[in-house]
Regions:
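Alpha-helical segment proximal to the catalytic Tyr-Lys
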Residues: 160, 164, 203-207
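Conserved NAD(P)H cofactor-binding loop of Rossmann-fold oxidoreductase domains
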Residues: 124-129
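Active-site helix of classical SDR
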Residues: 155, 190, 198
């Protein structure tokens, strides 16, 4: 016996119980170099490793980028390489532990892009040292201040700027696969904090049209890992 007629009859009865609306969607093709066309992004720790790779992917997608780093020489080198793409690329010396400087540097960033809305923040800057039982207090403070404290206060400055100006955009926090495991180092502890912060920011800023995401890369052949 063919069950299809019975199935169709039951489906028809089921659908008749609900109102059905039809939505027309126009699909369009977007080329790779236009995915982020016209957008402006800040990428911390953008001179090497994952940060530089993100910056390069962004400029290839048409995004204008502002990268930060602690070394002027490495910043200039990264900006020079990224400038071969047809987007605006600028660099700013920024120490993630110097929270007092964030407001002034962010104002300078806005001036550098002629007041264009900056609608993406990538919190990538980070440092790492030895884990327990070899961590010094100085190393602990450096890791937590750079990785977590810096991310917290940059997100606060940037989030307020977006909300105050009605800018809908994105914050991306770079955590680590280690944030999914028990913490036995300052680095892993900082990434646990970033994961929790990401969840909190996502909930707090969603109503303002700001999407907050986190990524948790595993071991990656970056200069920091190879030390």
């Amino acid at each position: 016996m063919n069950p299809l007629p019975t199935i169709k009859k039951k489906l028809k009865l089921l659908l008749n119980r609900f109102s059905v609306s039809y939505v027309k969607i126009d699909l369009m093709s977007v080329t790779q170099n236009e995915l982020l066309k016209g957008r402006y992004a800040i990428i911390t720790g953008g001179t090497s490793g994952i940060g530089y790779a993100i910056a390069e992917a962004f400029v290839k997608s048409g995004c204008n980028v502002i990268i930060t780093g602690r070394s002027k020489g490495r910043l200039d080198n990264a900006v020079s390489k990224l400038s071969r793409y047809n987007t605006k690329t600028v660099g700013f010396v920024l120490d993630n532990t110097n929270v007092a400087s964030f407001g002034l540097v962010f104002t300078q960033m806005q001036d550098a892009v002629n007041g264009q809305p900056i609608d993406i923040l990538v919190n990538n800057a980070g440092v790492n040292f030895k884990g327990m039982p070899y961590t010094t207090e100085e190393e602990y403070d450096s890791v937590l201040d750079t990785n977590l404290k810096g991310t917290f206060f940059l997100s606060q400055v940037f989030g307020k700027y977006m909300v105050d100006n009605g800018i809908k955009g994105n914050i991306l926090n770079v955590a680590s696969a280690s944030s999914l495991r028990p913490a036995n180092s300052a680095y892993t502890l900082s990434k646990w904090g970033i994961r929790g912060l990401t969840l909190g920011l996502a909930k707090a800023l969603a109503k303002d049209g700001i999407t907050v995401n986190g990524i948790a890369p595993g071991p990656t052949a970056t200069p920091m890992l190879m030390k």
